[in-house]
Amino acid sequence: MKYNLNQENQKWVDETFEKIKTKLSAECDRIGDKIPYIAENGVYQEDKAETDIVWWTNGFWPGILWQMYHATGEEKYKIAANGVEDKLDNAFDVYTGLHHDVGFMWLHSAVANYRITGNERSKARGLHAAHLLAGRYNPRGKFIRSWNRDRSGWVIVDSMMNVPLLYWARDTLGDPRFEYVAMDHVDTVMNNTVRKDGSCNHIIVLDTTNGELLETPGGQGYGSGSSWSRGQAWAIYGFALSYLYTKKEEYLDTAKKVAHYFISQVDLTDGVAVIDFRAPKEPVYWDSTAGVCAACGLLEISNHVPELEKEFYINAAIKILKATDEKFCNWDENYDSIVQMGSGSYFTEHDRHVPIIYGDYF
């Protein structure tokens, strides 16, 4: 996708992409078809293929590889991505532990493969994952169940990034049932997760018999009623993608509403996101991954708004990405990971201020 950038921003984009190519070429040589998650002291030591094949982030490394193959045509990226995808078949066999994040796992691996190469085996894998996701649908509550906990009425805003798998299955099979499930879920998230000011709940708990909202736990943010920044980012990008596939105006309006809230918050911290926009001012906890994901959503929004609106969203995205580059990126090709200072949640220490694989994907 081409964006109408001024000369300064275009120069920055071009130079940054050259750095990305250099860095990821070296990483691909080192990592190959292992499945990285968090880099420790500049090294992706854990291989999720060996330790947790059903982990929700396992699709991001092959997603990076497919992006690089698509951009450069270098075969090594394709070879490594295919290797990871083969390993992910074990997750289908395990089954227990898979949940709503099958979209994250197979959209960026198998579906990306099929879109780029036409690989029929990858198509089958993507459709298998789509059926698993659709099978989590609660027809009385009109939502897709999140996670595998003892409360089957839980829904998290992250799920918005997984429903594009269902739209892809709709198009691939010509079967509208996948869209019906997706849109019911997106409507439920829109009506119960997004607040009037554009901030979002991370978790909503719904009555499984009728979809009535029961409670809003704090989740990975500071607490109930707070504003977990990556959750806001999932909403921005997720609603924009649902608009892309359905053209339902309410989805674009919702994406814009959350985007305006997000932009107003990161403007207070020079373009980078804290973990939660409604947490105490001290201590300061950052989450770089929220910013880069939100930037993707802002660019997606810019593709669907009138010409006079486009510049606002593009410039906001570029500001976030430039700030991330300046404050949080490591371009040493001998050091695994680019985007530093990612955080999984507000209260956990082991995944606070660390490089997390999805930061580099977005």
Where does each model-flagged region fall?
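Glycan-recognition and catalytic cores of secretory/periplasmic carbohydrate-active enzymes
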Residues: 1-362
